[in-house]
């Protein structure tokens, strides 16, 4: 591993530790039981709050993950305050994001099949930035093109048909 990669890994692990400390304080204040798991995935720190009873963490997820998104931003700010650098840390609670990622991948694959069958673009429902990235990644893996359209919170992914080159 090069020194640059080792330095980046160390920095991301530090981000995870700072985030874990912040989130442990939050759990104490909210009187919630949970464990913090820290990892580095896809070039970013990844932190998850897990519990023996995942339903006990529902309040930290909120409807459609709104509270989770807010907590992620607050956690990123806590990391930035400590390190002086912007964080791209990902926070998951009780597997909510992992489950949503799988759902979005399935929805995207179904939409890709419709695009290929009809030759017409397919617009997906509005999603948050994390979910849109999941969709864009699946579309790219399948060799098609996608774009985002609209303004938050109604921003959506559009999957485009393959362009024929006239042959």
Predicted features along the sequence, with ranges:
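RNA-contacting regions in translation and RNA-metabolism proteins
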Residues: 1-167
């Amino acid at each position: 591993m090069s020194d640059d990669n080792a330095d980046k890994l160390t920095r991301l692990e530090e981000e995870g530790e700072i985030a874990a400390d912040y989130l442990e304080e939050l759990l104490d204040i909210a009187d919630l039981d949970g464990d913090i798991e820290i990892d580095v995935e896809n070039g970013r720190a990844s932190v998850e709050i897990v519990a023996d009873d995942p339903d006990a963490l529902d309040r930290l997820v909120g409807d459609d993950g709104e509270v989770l998104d807010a907590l992620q931003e607050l956690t990123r700010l806590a990391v930035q305050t400590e390190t002086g650098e912007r964080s791209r840390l990902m926070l998951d609670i009780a597997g909510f994001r992992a489950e949503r990622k799988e759902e979005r991948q399935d929805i995207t694959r179904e939409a890709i099949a419709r695009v290929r069958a009809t030759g017409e673009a397919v617009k997906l429902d509005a999603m948050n930035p994390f979910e849109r990235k999941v969709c864009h990644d699946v579309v790219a893996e399948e060799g098609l093109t996608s774009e985002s359209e609209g303004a938050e919170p109604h921003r959506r992914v559009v999957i485009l048909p393959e362009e024929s080159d006239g042959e």
